[in-house]
Amino acid sequence: LSVALPANAAIKVLATTSDWGSLVTELGGDKVNVYTATSPLQDVHRVDAKPSLVARARSADLIVATGAELESGWLPVLLQESGNSKIQPGAPGYFEITSALRLLDIPTAVDRSMGDVHALGNPHVQLDPRNIAAAAKALSTRLAQIDAPNAAYYQQRGADFQARWQQAMARW
C-alpha cells in the first residue's frame, strides 16, 4: 500500500469536510498538507466539482471522505475528472471514514416516497465522539501505510490523539 514520496514531501490530502481535515492535520502534523473541499457552513451533500477542486484532487496522495454515499452527488465526478489513479476507490489513497465504523439507522427498505434517505445508514458519524476515536485509529494506520518511512510518526501521533481524546470524553 505504500506510495513513493520524496523523502521530505508532505502527503497531499484532500478531505471532503473540515472535520476530517482537522483530524488528518492532528494525526499527520507536519507530514501532511491538507486541503478541505468544504467549509463548516457548506452542505456536504451538495458541492460543485469546480476546476479548482479537480486540480486539488489531481495532485492529492490521499482523499479522506465520509463515505456511506454522503458525498455521492459530487465526489464520483471529482474523482473521475481528476484522472488521479492514486485516489480512486480501492486504491490506497482513497479512504472512507465509514469503512472503519458501524453505521446506525440503516433503513430496511428505501423508496422515493421517503425523500432524501441515506440508504447505507446515517453518514453523520462525527456526531458521536466514539466514532472519532475509531476513525482516528483507522486513519493513522492508513497514513502509516501510504507513507511507510514515517509510519512510527503517525502511530505515535495516533496514540497521543487517542489518549487526549479519551481524557476529553471522560470529562464530557
Give the role of each language-model region.
Residues 5, 9-172:
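Extracytoplasmic metal-acquisition and chelation regions
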